């Protein structure tokens, strides 16, 4: 188990509540429950417990990224730190939630984040991210000649082989 609590930020359509659609009640995963619940259960199996050291930062995905961070993620991180008595959190963001995590790091309070983990986050925009998701090939070859691209590619391959050997108990 990690030393810091996890704050998970779901992706587009991953939050449902009165702030998103009036009359739907308190925040939850809503229709995305079947998508996110298995991930939460994996974190539970690693020793994380919801509302103890695992928290969900729901938000109104119709708002801009910065507005969502300001209204939802930033206050949630502050509440988690106060509740757990820690000075840092681990942010895990899926898809649009990863963009909120990145905005938090860039414009809010990065010193309070031990790690930012982005899963399926469209950092290059949704169209470019789709090519990786659908088959791993970029539609133009100039990118493959780029030094930064090749460095990231090698880094991901090394990351995969290193963490593939680590067993999670």
Report residues per predicted region.
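Alpha/beta-hydrolase-fold enzymes
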Residues: 141-169
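N-terminal non-catalytic accessory region
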Residues: 1-149
């Amino acid at each position: 188990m990690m030393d810091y609590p996890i704050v998970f930020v779901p992706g587009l359509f991953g939050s449902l509540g009165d702030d998103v659609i009036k009359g739907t009640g308190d925040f939850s995963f809503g229709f995305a429950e079947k998508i996110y619940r298995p991930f939460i259960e994996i974190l539970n199996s690693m020793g994380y417990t919801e509302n103890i050291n695992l928290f969900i930062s729901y938000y109104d995905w119709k708002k801009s990224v910065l507005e969502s961070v300001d209204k939802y993620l930033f206050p949630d991180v502050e509440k988690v730190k106060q509740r757990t008595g820690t000075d840092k959190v681990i942010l895990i963001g899926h898809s649009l939630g990863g963009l909120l995590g990145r905005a938090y790091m860039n414009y809010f309070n990065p010193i309070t984040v031990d790690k930012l983990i982005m899963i399926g986050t469209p950092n290059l925009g949704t169209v470019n991210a789709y090519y990786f998701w659908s088959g791993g090939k970029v539609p133009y070859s100039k990118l493959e000649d780029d030094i930064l691209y090749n460095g990231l590619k090698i880094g991901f391959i090394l990351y995969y082989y290193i963490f593939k050997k680590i067993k999670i108990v």
